[in-house]
Amino acid sequence: MDMNKTLVAYFSCTGTTRRAAQALAAAVDADVYEIRPQIPYTPADLDWRNKKSRSSVEMNDPDFRPALADKNAAIDAYNTIFVGFPIWWYVAPTIINTFLESGDFSGKKIVLFATSGGSGFGKTAAALKKSLSPDAALVEGKLLNTGLSPADLRAWCQSLAL
């Protein structure tokens, strides 16, 4: 794998996905980019038990696209882009769709990774594929919750034949 052409882009509200992204980037010597919303999420926004919380409202509208704080990911410089996020309502938060729709991922390999308190990827990859150009290769990665060593992460990346 050409490590100089790899980016780990991630969205994290509580720090769990940030830690996973940083560990992955360190293990494969990749650059890191944080996907940030223009309006940061508050703890109240993330209350999944409240049907009127910001995250609940956004996730109940599959066409909703939260604005990004910036579009400085320099996608053109990378061949492989890991995209990480927490699983919300069994799929990726809609800000991931915003990110994927905001750049030209043509000819890129996109490898998903996620963190989750209990659910798996579900239909995440299929839902995100719709936000990518047809010639972008989307790979459903794995959950990177806790306990993966740098060697485990490198082995996983090597198994992807990037």
Feature-to-residue mapping (PLM):
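Acidic catalytic loop of the alpha/beta-hydrolase fold
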Residues: 89-90, 118
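Glycine-rich, N-terminal phosphate-binding loop of Rossmann-like dinucleotide-binding domains
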Residues: 85-86
